[in-house]
Amino acid sequence: MKLKSLLLCTFIGLSSLAQAETVHVTTAGSLKTLVDTTARVIDDLTLTGSVNRSDLHYLRNHVKKLNLKDVTIAEETVGKVLYPDNVMPDSVFIGDKVLSSIVLPSGIVEIGKCAFNEVRGAAFTVDFSNCKHLQTIRNNAFSESNLQEVNLDGLTALQTIDAYAFYWTDIKRISLEGCSSLIMLGERAFCNNYFVTSVNLKGCTSLQSVGNRAFLNIGKQSKDAGTLDFSETAIESFDESSLQSSWVKTVIFPATLKTISAKALYLSKAANLKFLDDVPPTFGTQWMSDSALKHVNITVPAGKVKAYADAFGLSGADAKNLADANGATLGINRISAATASAQKRYNMAGQRVGNGYRGIVIENGKKVVR
């Protein structure tokens, strides 16, 4: 009995090992002659050499784990459609229900439209780490897939993430750290990613625009997508509804900011906003709901509380959560008129001043702007 069990375990082990295959493709277009996918799913396949769109499409729904790191993608024309070299072809794995892991080719410069759209392999993961020449991720490249994470760290050649590129996936973490050439996040690029818990934009120094609804509904299921820190970016404009209904705790805006468009933060759950430019941006209609604006904690540059209060249209008690980097506020103390006149105030030199003094004063141990 023990011998039978040992033989069975050995057979199972050998069967598992047999499923890991490495194939070198000398001539692009010849994969069919090297790998038989008839009525089978390959657990683990590594390709090397040269392949084209037909080779890759041939593997659709037939491979669980695919390593293309050392593959070169060759140009191919199918009908009247040209599939360029060094580009992950449009729609090549669209609707794949088996693929759960892929290591992308190191030489690609672009991921085509819908390349991995609706890939539903269990816990789908993509390794971008070797893609040092990647410049563009096209429309819907990974949309509506089971993708678990977007880790584009260190991809210094990446310039554009197009519309709907990562729309409605299962991603929990977005990291663009070190994407120093990234210029644009397209319309709905990360929209409806309900499970996100963190977003890393550190080092995205060239980022200029965040598209319409780019982060709409982010973190809706996780209830906390953390902090959206745009401070190192060069963003001048947040498009309409770009952060609408997002479940982020804190948003830090860059010093380059000029415009926050209509409904950019409408229905957002943000509890903290921080602005870095001395000049308030232009705010579009309902950029944030009136009630939320009165309750969110807002930090602005030193000495700029009044300018921002005017830009927000806040005054009196409605501005109680607005303060500058030094803690100075508009002086909303919620005290009676009778006691207000007797309130002791001191300037920054420690000298007592009267009610007519204008500038930063100390009241009740707090800095306020008069």
What residue ranges belong to the model's regions?
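C-terminal tail/sorting-segment detector
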Residues: 3, 360-370
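Sec-dependent N-terminal signal peptides
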Residues: 5-14
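Sec/Tat signal peptide C-region and signal peptidase I cleavage site
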Residues: 14-20
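Structural signature of tandem-repeat unit edges
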Residues: 20-26, 43-51, 63-86, 97-110, ...
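Terminal processing/anchoring signals of secreted or surface-associated proteins
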Residues: 45, 308, 331-332, 350, ...
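Consensus positions within tandem repeat domains that build extended binding/scaffold surfaces
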Residues: 90-92, 112-115, 138-141, 162-165, ...
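A recurrent domain-boundary module in secreted/ectodomain proteins
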Residues: 307-331
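Residue-level detector of functionally pivotal "anchor" positions at catalytic/ligand-binding pockets or at interdomain
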Residues: 326-349
